[in-house]
């Protein structure tokens, strides 16, 4: 079965652009890149020429005698004369380009030639994306795919755009959801927390209507990721990257979720592991949430590189790494146990990252003041609190009330509760997190009345 993705609309818009450049779709392994491109290709082109540099390494020779479009087309035709090139109606799809990054140099010449559309895809494991950038700057477009977000999960469940728009209207107008809406969406969101958004897992759940077999699929994905680390990481970094990856659930279970390299291995030091954390982030396997030096704008560059939290790029992978008893209890009884706070922080971090936000938090030294996340509007810095328990979001209210943080005027609290507003704090259900960026854009345009007139 094909799962509708947000990338579908992006690809259609890309094709309708008369000045389109070759496209590179990057992202972690097994998030649906190949399936999405194949679906788009078969519905939009008379001919599709697909080259997979992992499954068919013989095609790595197509750049041996040059990067010109005609040269590469000729070499592909020599290797397989059945592949047809129809000018103006052919998509050339280079898949798994991490196995042959040299192909990206050719994108400039395909752009200049203009006879064929080109899409590249790859996981970017073990290669320098900066090298690819330098080889194709000005002649390509980038797009990043991740696993399904909650909106795409709702699509898979059969909910249409009208349901999503109704959700968004509730947020903009600060109108609480009905009891039925809260029950339905909260239940669906908890299912999403357990399953995650990896297409194979979601598709299995949709086909069967149950969770049977999904844990096995999730754990196989973990094994595949661990194997990728062994395959692509080099030298002593291989063991270090695996240690960091495998230690994420343990560190998230702590009250203080800051990732501590010293707990990964005896004598471990950050300077030895810096590249390992960056490797995992670049691969898309994890999301890094960086500790701000001070809660003020701008966000970029305003952080301590030695302080960070690590979340999985897909929360379903976090679930898969729990022990059997915890994982079974979560599926059967929705009991999150000691992982409750970690689970909700993880799912919010994932939703924010998939919305295009970089992740930042703040912890004041020698103080209990700590804020889970920060986003921004055009003018203001906005703290985001994740409440797994009932509470008053004390740190957020301190940030809003204090004259020491003039760029913070209101905050957003995400919880299991309904929509509400009190003392400059807008409360919304967890399941609406994927709409937060859109809501703040509406605020910037004066179209979110509650945020424009917060209670004082």
Predicted regions and their residues:
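Accessory nucleic acid-recognition modules appended to NTPase machines
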Residues: 203-378
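N-terminal pre-Walker A segment at the start of P-loop NTPase domains
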Residues: 1-14
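Hydrophobic positions on the alpha1 helix immediately C-terminal to the Walker A/P-loop
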Residues: 36, 40
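Domain-level recognition of nuclease-like catalytic cores that cleave nucleotide substrates
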Residues: 418-456
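Interdomain motor-coupling "hinge/lid" segment immediately C-terminal to the ATP-binding subdomain
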Residues: 131-250
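Short glycine-rich substrate-engagement loop in P-loop NTPases that contacts/grips substrate
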Residues: 55-88
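Conserved lysine of the Walker
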Residues: 33
